[in-house]
């Protein structure tokens, strides 16, 4: 009887140890997955949101520089730059903008972002045509006509591009907020796994103590039986 009871107790302990091992492995796997998801979220927040937001700022900065150069050339009566020199500077800014756009396109883009980016590329192309048209008419139009040409087309083109850049900036904010919420959910999930692990350890510990206590009771009864 004592041998049978001992086998039964060892079986229970073995099952409990197996449960401990299984639960520990499961929780560990879930925690590893959470950590990977968190790393992915933070990486996306930096590479796909923070860096593009910075690039959008640089594009806006270069766009403003282009507008300032062309506007100064059109409205100033004493230009320090020739039409060719201005054209070279505008092309240099265009090249920088194209480089930033190519870099931006390699990041992860949401659908709304893709639409705004396509719209931006079209407007930038239209803007290049307008700038070229103004420069081509420098020697054929007087200052008043040249200013009218700028006011009627180029100025609005710059404003449209700025508005599109603003929309892209808003996308970074919205998607960045979503990534932040996702990261917070992952953190809460990780805390839950840790709490479950602690509760399981407490429950299994209590069961082991109860088994050992029951074993001591049986041993005392057997000792009394032997004394009798």
Where are these regions (language model features)?
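Membrane-proximal N-terminal soluble sensing/regulatory segments of transmembrane proteins
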Residues: 44-119, 143-149
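A structural signal for well-ordered alpha-helices, especially hydrophobic packing surfaces
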Residues: 39, 63, 67-70, 94, ...
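Individual transmembrane alpha-helices with interfacial aromatic-anchor signatures
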Residues: 51-55, 149-158, 187-196
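Extracytoplasmic
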Residues: 147-185
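Polar/charged, Q/E/K-enriched amphipathic alpha-helical segments with strong coiled-coil propensity
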Residues: 80, 109-162
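A structural signal for long alpha-helical coiled-coils and helix-turn connectors
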Residues: 43-46, 74, 105-108, 135-139, ...
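Hydrophobic membrane-targeting segments
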Residues: 1-50, 190-228
């Amino acid at each position: 009887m004592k041998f049978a009871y001992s086998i039964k107790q060892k079986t229970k302990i073995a099952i409990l140890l197996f449960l401990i091992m299984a639960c520990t492995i499961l929780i560990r796997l879930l925690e590893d997955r959470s950590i990977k998801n968190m790393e992915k979220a933070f990486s996306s927040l930096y590479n796909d949101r923070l860096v593009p937001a910075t690039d959008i700022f640089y594009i806006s900065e270069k766009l403003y520089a282009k507008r300032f150069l062309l506007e100064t050339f059109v409205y100033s009566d004493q230009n320090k730059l020739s039409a060719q020199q201005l054209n070279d500077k505008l092309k240099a800014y265009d090249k920088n903008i194209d480089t930033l756009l190519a870099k931006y396109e390699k990041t992860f883009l949401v659908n709304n972002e893709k639409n705004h980016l396509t719209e931006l590329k079209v407007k930038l192309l239209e803007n290049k045509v307008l700038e070229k048209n103004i420069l081509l008419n420098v020697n054929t139009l007087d200052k008043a006509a040249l200013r009218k040409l700028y006011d009627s087309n180029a100025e609005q083109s710059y404003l449209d591009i700025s508005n599109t850049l603003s929309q892209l900036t808003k996308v970074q904010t919205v998607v960045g907020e979503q990534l932040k919420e996702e990261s917070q959910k992952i953190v809460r999930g990780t805390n839950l796994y840790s709490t479950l692990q602690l509760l399981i350890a407490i429950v299994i510990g209590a069961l082991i103590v109860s088994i050992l206590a029951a074993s001591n009771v049986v041993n005392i009864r057997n000792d009394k039986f032997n004394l009798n």
